[in-house]
Amino acid sequence: FKEALNKNFITYQKQVISNAKHLSECLVTAGFNIVSGGTDTHLLLLDLSNKNITGKAAEEALDSAGITVNKNTVPFETRSPFITSGIRIGTPALTTRGMENKEMAKVAEMIINTLEHIQEPEFHKKTRTNIKDLCDQFPLYAELASKNNYQ
């Protein structure tokens, strides 16, 4: 609990939520439905019913593009829990890397483009390269990597 009282942790948590809200807004602007219309937490639940994409297909396509999400049921779900109509997206890992709202817009664009090209594995490879480039700008353990000259 001591960490939660730290000013840096409070700032981090505010950024996690800000990132989730911004990511949500970008996806809504592109015509995606967010369960509850948005988010006030670190997670958002994307309902893909209006896009005729299953949660399982979205999870697999995004994974091949280097974006980790989880398939998830949505309210009034009609599909099997092994297939689902939604995906769950969280922002803590992105925020931990130092990403902010500007980067959430880029992540949203890559999610949108991947789902629009869900049947195109070559497109997923291109997106995976873009994801790697973005992550390289925000390395985990940057201090350790620079100290030891890791690439």
Predicted segments — roles?
Residues 2-35, 40-41, 56-65:
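Conserved PLP-dependent catalytic core of the aminotransferase class-I/II
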Residues 3-6, 24-30, 52-57, 90-92, ...:
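Short, charged low-complexity intrinsically disordered segments located at boundaries
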Residues 33-87, 91-98, 149:
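Conserved PLP-binding catalytic core of the aspartate aminotransferase-like
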Residues 4-12, 43, 90-96, 116:
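Short beta-alpha connecting loops at secondary-structure transitions
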Residues 12, 40, 58-60, 73-74, ...:
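Composition- and surface-driven signal marking solvent-exposed, interaction-prone regions
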Residues 18, 81-151:
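PLP-dependent enzyme catalytic core of the Aspartate aminotransferase-like
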Residues 2, 21, 28, 49, ...:
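Hydrophobic alpha-helix feature that most strongly marks membrane-spanning transmembrane helices
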